[in-house]
Amino acid sequence: MGVVALPALAGCGSSDQPHAEIPTRYQIPIPVCTTPLPPVARKAGGRAVVRNLDPEQWMGVVAPTFNPRGGLGPTDTDCTGHYLFANESLRGGISTKGWPRPFDPEELDLRAGPEGMRVLWLRVLKFENGDVGGPVALVRAVDDRAEVYGIGSFRGPAKSKVSPVRIGNENIAVAESTICPDLDDCRKRADFYLARRGRLIDSAQVDLERTAVVPSVTERGLYAKYTLRTDVTYKPNGIQLLEQVQVKIIHYDVGERDSDRDLRMVEFSRFLRVERDTLFSSNDPLWERVVGQD
């Protein structure tokens, strides 16, 4: 476990740091990096004090060599020694402000989860298709320290969000993005990241919503529309998925053909179970088994 100092925090008084409290009995993963913070007094009951840091402070936790005045460099490293921007998912990304890139706190997306867990997503790279991307980290600031549990990267549409979620003893990051190249071909997807050996590993992808219009195989000359909805429930031992696919013949102005009607609704439940570095699915996605079959 690496321990790095954060000089920028040394002068911050504890009274200026908003905080909450959590019970110490929660099982928290072992951090790969720890940064000392100015101490705060614990209150009665042995409850850990969750700290709220500003964007510059969080950047100093994830990337110890970060200097707000100097900006971000293309070869900057994180607290584990890996390059921040050298990831296959970020290939082709461009810093439109050049390098070194001035740090803009608005580009650091911060989302909170249970027990003080947070996910940071630094959205500084742009791609030809309109996506944005950059490093992502699962972190927590508690009592007299800030901890990093995993660092990776994510690329997705500008309105994507990456949030921390707890399943049993696992703290994971969940990235949700909506991709709609066409109104008849639209999908909302979730990527589930496990923290392993200091890295955030994309361990499963699930369609939360999806639509597709394809030629009907039972009604020649007409088109079938498939609509998927997935309910996600986080369990102590994994993720429960309830998938529903509605199939209907869409309206088509041709003669007196019977269009614009529901055909059927298909429902199926499957489970994503944590197995080492992946989330193992108990079955194939319902979408792959239904689309094109009417």
Locations of the language-model features?
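C-terminal motif of bacterial Sec signal peptides marking the signal peptidase cleavage site
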Residues: L9-G11
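Acidic, small-residue rich beta-repeat scaffolds with periodic aromatic anchors
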Residues: S14-N87, P181-D294
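Short N-terminal edge-element motif at the start of the domain
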Residues: L90-I167
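Short, solvent-exposed coil/turn segments at beta-strand boundaries
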Residues: G113-M117, V142-D143, V165-I172, R197-G198, ...
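Short beta-strand elements that form the blades of beta-propeller/WD-repeat-like
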Residues: G116-K126, E170-I179, I239-K248
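Eukaryote-skewed repeat-based solenoidal scaffolds used as protein-protein interaction platforms
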Residues: S153-A195, Q205-L208
